């Protein structure tokens, strides 16, 4: 019989907020008796946007902006119902995107 595993992927633009959220999840899972693997840092996505500085002329004058998306992966091995209930009640910041797979 295959043991159950919860895989949590976190994404955020601010890596400090992301690390705090990952730490909260790990502490909550360990407190309820589940074993945890992670948080594993995944590669950071970097999107670069180039725009013209001037609305009319000066094609050579451009400005570049970048947006970085930081990601973390947490595996909760052998979760019990208490672990799932505690994770459901966990309050995380709005800037962190959470994707959960069972």
Swiss-Prot record:
Instruction: Please name one Pfam family that this protein belongs to.
Output: Ribosomal_S10
The answer to keyword Metal-binding applying to this record is no
Tell me which domain of life the UniProt entry assigns to the organism this sequence originates from: Bacteria
Q: For this UniProt record, give its keywords in alphabetical order, as a comma-separated list.
A: Ribonucleoprotein, Ribosomal protein
Q: Which GO terms describe its cellular component?
A: ribonucleoprotein complex; ribosome
Signal sequence: where? none
Question: Listed GO molecular functions?
Answer: structural constituent of ribosome; tRNA binding
InterPro entries annotated for this entry?
Ribosomal_uS10, Ribosomal_uS10_CS, Ribosomal_uS10_dom, Ribosomal_uS10_dom_sf
**Which family, according to UniProt?**
Belongs to the universal ribosomal protein uS10 family.
Q: What does this protein do?
A: Involved in the binding of tRNA to the ribosomes.
Q: What is this protein called?
A: Small ribosomal subunit protein uS10
């Amino acid at each position: 019989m295959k043991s159950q595993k919860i895989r949590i992927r976190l994404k955020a633009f601010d890596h400090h907020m992301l690390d705090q959220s990952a730490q909260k999840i790990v502490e909550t899972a360990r407190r309820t008796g589940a074993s945890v693997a992670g948080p594993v840092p995944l590669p950071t996505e970097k999107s670069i946007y180039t725009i013209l500085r001037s609305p009319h002329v000066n094609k050579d004058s451009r400005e570049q902006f970048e947006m970085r998306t930081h990601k973390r992966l947490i595996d909760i091995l052998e979760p019990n119902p208490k672990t799932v209930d505690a994770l459901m009640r966990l309050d995380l910041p709005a800037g962190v995107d959470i994707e959960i797979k069972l």
